[in-house]
Design a protein with these regions (language model features):
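Bacterial N-terminal signal peptides that target proteins for export
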Residues: 2-26
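Scaffold/interface architecture of coatomer-like assemblies
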Residues: 25-347
């Protein structure tokens, strides 16, 4: 069985694993209520608002940069062309990110290879939560190693998120370096990275509306996950969630145990991020974790959303490729590669 996403106080049910849902609406005035079990630390409810959800509307959250990497925040609907499976689509809704609520999950690797970095991660994440979470935003916190643990459920309180960060402790899992002549039995469990992304997408984000993002802090090494990187990407796409990866390696750990000077998981992080519209930030001596969090914060506040109704009206659950083209030269669009169409009969 796959490792479960555990709350520190109560177990989170997995009943929604195989439930198919339609497209979520982003252009709404308030955040929809989650279908999850009662929150560990509930936030005060907003005024009741009637929300109309258009299940056929496809929403895309994206960023635009110069070829040198600078964010471009002031483009308009007329600056873009949109294609689905090579066919041009009509952009029906367009907005620059200003007041659209953000739902964010921070997933932190606590395996042995990250043990020396946890204090740095705790401090940097605390500062990030304090500066980025606004009244209508919500965030949750998950640690992953030999298991996946929900340290703090949805809240818009930086104080509660910081309290959850205090529960970060290395759990001893991680890559086995220079194994001996006698192999272990079964698949060793040490860093359930793919499971953590899969569970966060299915349990926490699938039923949410608005802008959604997962932030991973890890060296990218997965060991023992039940799900594959492909499974993790698929569920993030179905949840309309962007994955941002912070590639953070402790070179001393790998040199000490004969693994060179870095983890080998950067490729999987790039797959997850590029396919969902995010990207990989590399942390090193010249580019600290604090620096990376500041860059992410800037990107989250300089995004665009667009919505369209596909010309392909088939409700077949198929994967469809998306391409957004910007008309100005020397600019690059950062967006997810595609989406899964609503399946007939899906709720």
């Amino acid at each position: 069985m796959v490792g479960r996403l555990l709350r520190k106080v109560t177990l989170a049910g997995l009943a929604c694993f195989l439930v198919s849902v339609g497209m979520s609406a982003w252009f709404v005035p308030a955040r929809a209520q989650s279908s999850q079990s009662p929150q560990q630390n509930p936030s005060p409810p907003d005024d009741q608002t009637v929300i109309r959800v258009d299940v056929d509307l496809v929403n895309i959250l994206f960023s635009v940069r110069t070829k040198k990497g600078q964010l471009i925040p002031n483009l308009n609907k007329e600056d873009f062309d949109l294609y689905e499976d090579g066919k041009k689509q009509e952009i029906q809704r367009f907005s620059r990110e200003t007041d659209i609520p953000l739902t964010l999950g921070l997933l932190i690797d606590i395996s042995a290879s990250q043990e020396n970095l946890i204090d740095i991660e705790r401090n940097a994440a605390s500062s990030f939560f304090a500066s980025v979470i606004r009244p209508k935003d919500e965030a949750f916190l998950i640690s992953f190693g030999k298991s996946t643990d929900l340290l703090q459920d949805y809240t818009n309180s930086p104080r509660l998120l910081m309290a959850g960060l205090k529960d970060l402790h290395a759990d001893g899992g991680g890559p086995i370096m220079n194994p001996g002549a006698v192999p272990g039995i079964g698949k060793p469990k040490g860093t359930l990275l793919f499971d953590a992304v899969y569970l966060a997408a299915t349990e926490k984000l699938r039923g949410e509306v608005g802008r959604k993002a997962l932030v991973l802090i890890t060296d990218g090494e997965d060991q023992g996950s039940y799900y594959t990187v492909k499974n993790a990407i698929e569920q993030a796409q179905k949840a309309d969630t962007i994955v941002y990866s912070f590639y953070y390696v402790d070179p001393y750990f790998y040199s000490r145990y004969g693994g060179g000077f870095g983890g080998g998981g950067e490729g999987d992080l790039r797959k997850m991020s590029s396919e969902t519209g995010g990207h990989v930030f590399t942390v090193d001596r010249k580019h600290t974790l604090q620096d990376v969090f500041k860059e992410l914060q800037e990107e989250l506040r300089n995004q665009y959303t667009l919505g369209y109704t596909p010309s392909n009206t088939a409700r077949d659950g198929s994967y469809r490729k998306i391409e957004i083209k910007v008309k100005q030269p020397d600019m690059v669009v950062q967006a997810r590669k595609g989406y899964y169409a609503t399946k007939a009969g899906a709720q």
